[in-house]
Each structure stands twice: as structure tokens, then as C-alpha cells.
Regions:
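Conserved ABC ATPase signature
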Residues: 151-156, 160, 419-423, 427
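A short, proline-enriched helix->beta-strand linker immediately N-terminal to the Walker B motif
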Residues: 171-175, 438-442, 458
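ABC ATPase NBD Q-loop/coupling interface
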Residues: 69-87, 125, 196, 339-357, ...
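Conserved ABC ATPase "signature" region
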Residues: 128-147, 397-414
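ABC ATPase NBD coupling module
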Residues: 77-94, 112, 120, 242-247, ...
Length: 461
């Protein structure tokens, strides 16, 4: 019998509460990964899959503790001892995090950040270091790597940033690559490119891969074996082909073929709530000392739009097609040309107050809940910020509204004193939805709200 590259035995993970209580998040799971194998760990938001992966390299938050035994080839180690895991981190095990924009330092170029990953584990001259970084960028198929070397994270698209994260994870030629939801919030075209890239790198770098995802279907043709997690437990495992052909658990069946009930709008009003005419958005091209002007980019070109009261309108398009620009212009968060009108009675207000009243009636849930939620605010402050700013409710009424909004998105009141980084991606999106609906808007704009959610939670949303 082959010796696994990595084994996790009886892994349990606990959250230490504010009042000294302990909550079990992951319960006695066992995972084996062999050399050259592609293993997928699948589960819905909050199932414990990302925490399980973080525990392998000692990256759990301070309030969360792990117990159990890890085994790297023939070396046993205690999963509770964070210091014993440092020897694997970045060298033997590379890690791709879920949100590249958050993981990358906005103040340093990508060349410098990848270089730091290399020099942490090896001494290498600067000239050789640059060549090695550029070679890594070529390996991950980042276009024009010599130029991208000096770019900052904000100058790259979501897919490009994810390629940079992959390059960082591969920088010390690890034996195991852990990819935590690497295609979350990317459109289907870019998703396929990233998955194809990981497939090719698996062969060229002789990698084992632990791929964490909520989307069972995207690993159907990639993974050798699957582990299905639910509520902190592994409920099913096996070869990918066997699980897809004959799933034994009802939850797995629902992941493979989620049954989404289509609910028709109960409101069938002919009244137009919002109209947009000749709506155009242009972004200025880059300027420099040597070029006084450059071609502007047209994101929207003379768009006409009517949204009726009670109507659900879908806007479909791939990355870069202008969907988000349309949403931001309707919210009046960016400059636009054309006319946008909300057909509601307008109180007599000053211009600044009119805009505030407009945005009370038009709310948005952004695509990436991690970057749209302030890391410095508690969940109570995040959800209540909007209603507090309007100063039309008492302190007691605000508290009632916060609790009601929280219950509507199926989160309990214990979450109110916690912070965004303590939640899974799906839970953060629920918080973002609660922040929007607490305002009781007439129009709710959802910018790809389910792209980062698993099939079961997508169905719930």
C-alpha cells in the first residue's frame, strides 16, 4: 500500500467563544493525499473545508484551535502545534488563497511579492531572482510577464491576480498545492482558464493538489478522489467517477443536481420603478508625462433600461461586458452620461440629501463580500451603519432592525460582535445582503451575488 504524501487523522477544530464557551467546527475528519493525486474537498459555506486546509499549515486564526495528527510522508506532527507546521509552509506545501486582492499587498509590486516568497526559503542574487520570478509568471501564463513584474495588484484583473497567487504558491517548488476556492468570483471563461492551468502545472511541477471548492461540477473531470463535507464532518468520499455515478448521501445528490424552484413574481405591476435612457459610461485611458491623452474605454454605450415595480430583471454577460458599470451608474457611484430616474414621490430636499434618499431606495450587494465589508467594523456596525446614518430611528429601533435583517439571512445574533474575517465567503455574502435589506430599498441590485457560493447556498439565496 502506498504511503500518502499527507495524512490528516482525527482532525477536529474548535472556536473559543468570548464567554469561555467552545464550539466544535470540524469533527474528527480523516483525509489522505497521495503523490501526484488531485483530491477535491467539497462542501457548502461554513462546512469547515477551508479551516481544515488552513490547519495543515498552521494558519488558523488565534481564536480557533485544532487537534489531531498530521503525517507528512513518514514524519508525524501535532496539528495543535503551530510552530511545528512552519517547516512545511511555503516550502513543502504551497497555498492559494480564496481572495487574491486581499492576500496580495497593495503597496508592493507583484515581482517583489513573489521574490519575497523565494528569498524566505533560499538565498539568491537579485539578478537571478528577477529571472526566476519572470519564469514563474510565464509558467502561470500571465501575459507580458516582463511588464507585469512591476505592476501592483490593483492594476491586474481578478484572473491575473489569481495567476500571481499561483506563481507565489509554486515559487519554492512544493510537493503539495492547496487551492482554496481559486476560481470563486471569476466568470466561467476565466474559471476554465485557471482550472486548465492547474491541470497543466500538476504535470509540469509533479504536484499533488488539494482543491477546495463549493462547486462539485467543476472538479468532475479533474479530481481523482472527492471528500464531501457538511457541518464539519466528511459525509462521503471516494473516487470521483464512483461518487458522480452513485452518490450515497442525499446532500451529495443535491450538489450534483440542485433542484432550484423558480418563483414567479407576485407583483405584476405595470408601473415603472426605475428608467435609464441613453446611459453611457466611459473610463479615461492611462495618461503619462509623454502622452497628453489616450483612448478612453467605453464600458456602456447608450443603454436603455426600464425596471417595473416587483420585477426581477437579469443582466447577463462575461467579465468586462459592462454589468458592474451598469450597476454602479444606477447607484450614481460613478460618472455617467444619460438620464436615470427613480419614479417615486420625492420629498423636498437639498441636492446632497436627495442623493442620500435615492440611495436609501436603491441598494446593492457587491460580488466580493470580503472587500466590500470593512475589516475594522463588527457585524453589528456593518449592518446598522446605513440606518444609523439616516437618523430616523431610535437606538432601540435600530437594534430591532439589525436583528430582523440578521434573521432574514439565517444568521444568529451571536455573529454581531464578530468581524468579517471570522466568516466563510457565503456567510460574508449573507451579511452583505443583510446590510442592503435593512434599508428596505425599493430596488435591490445584486452584482453576481452567488458566484462565490456553493450550490446549496446558491439555492437558498
Amino acid at each position: 500500500m502506498r504511503t500518502p504524501l499527507l495524512s490528516l487523522e482525527n482532525l477536529s477544530i474548535y472556536l473559543n467563544g468570548f464567554k469561555g464557551d467552545t464550539k466544535k467546527l470540524v469533527s474528527n475528519i480523516n483525509i489522505n493525499i497521495h503523490r501526484g493525486e488531485f483530491v477535491a474537498l467539497i462542501g457548502e459555506s461554513g462546512s469547515g473545508k477551508s479551516l481544515s486546509a488552513l490547519s495543515t499549515v498552521g494558519l488558523l486564526p488565534s481564536a480557533i484551535k485544532a487537534s489531531g495528527t498530521g503525517k507528512w510522508l513518514n514524519l508525524n506532527y501535532d496539528l495543535a502545534e503551530h510552530n511545528s507546521l512552519k517547516m512545511f509552509r511555503g516550502k513543502e506545501i504551497g497555498f492559494i488563497f480564496q481572495e487574491p486582492l486581499v492576500s496580495l499587498n497593495p503597496l508592493h509590486t507583484i515581482g517583489k511579492q513573489i521574490g519575497e516568497c523565494i528569498t524566505t526559503h533560499a538565498h539568491i542574487p537579485n539578478a537571478d531572482l528577477k529571472h526566476k520570478v519572470i519564469a514563474l509568471l510565464k509558467d502561470v501564463k500571465l501575459d507580458d510577464p516582463e511588464r507585469r513584474f512591476n505592476h501592483y495588484p490593483h492594476q491586474l484583473s481578478g484572473g491575473q491576480r489569481q495567476r500571481v497567487m499561483i506563481a507565489m504558491a509554486l515559487s519554492n517548488k512544493p510537493k503539495l498545492l492547496i487551492a482554496d476556492e481559486p476560481t470563486t468570483a471569476l466568470d466561467v471563461t476565466i474559471q476554465k482558464e485557471i482550472l486548465d492551468l492547474l491541470h497543466s502545472l500538476r504535470a509540469s511541477y509533479d504536484l499533488s493538489i488539494l482543491f477546495i471548492t463549493h462547486n462539485l461540477k467543476i472538479v468532475k473531470n479533474l479530481a481523482d478522489r472527492l471528500y464531501i463535507m457538511k457541518e464539519g464532518e466528511i459525509i462521503e468520499s471516494g473516487k470521483t467517477e464512483d461518487v458522480f455515478k452513485k452518490p450515497s448521501h442525499a446532500y451529495t445528490k443535491d450538489l450534483i443536481e440542485p433542484k432550484i424552484k423558480i418563483i414567479k413574481s407576485r407583483l405584476n405591476s405595470p408601473k415603472i420603478l426605475l428608467s435609464a435612457e441613453n446611459l453611457s459610461v466611459k473610463y479615461k485611458g492611462p495618461r503619462s508625462l509623454f502622452r497628453s491623452s489616450s483612448k478612453d474605454f467605453c464600458a456602456l454605450n447608450k443603454v436603455f433600461l426600464n425596471i417595473k415595480l416587483g420585477e426581477t430583471l437579469g443582466v447577463v454577460g462575461e467579465s468586462g461586458s459592462g454589468k458592474t458599470s451598469l450597476a454602479l451608474s444606477i447607484l450614481k457611484l460613478i460618472d455617467y452620461q444619460g438620464d436615470i430616474k427613480l419614479h417615486l414621490p420625492e420629498p423636498r430636499l437639498r441636492k446632497k440629501e436627495r442623493l442620500k434618499n435615492y440611495r436609501r431606495n436603491v441598494q446593492i450587494v457587491f460580488q466580493d463580500p470580503f472587500s466590500s465589508l470593512s475589516p475594522r467594523l463588527s457585524i453589528r456596525d456593518i449592518i446598522g451603519e446605513g440606518v444609523i446614518s439616516h437618523r430616523i430611528f431610535s437606538k432601540e429601533q435600530v437594534e430591532e432592525k439589525i436583528l430582523l435583517a440578521l434573521s432574514r439571512v439565517d444568521l444568529d445574533k451571536d455573529t454581531l460582535e464578530r468581524y468579517p474575517h471570522e466568516f466563510s465567503g457565503g456567510q460574508r455574502q449573507r451579511i452583505a445582503i443583510a446590510r442592503a435589506i435593512i434599508m428596505e430599498p425599493k430596488l435591490l441590485i445584486l452584482d453576481e451575488p452567488t458566484s462565490s457560493l456553493d450550490a446549496a447556498v446558491q439555492k437558498q439565496i
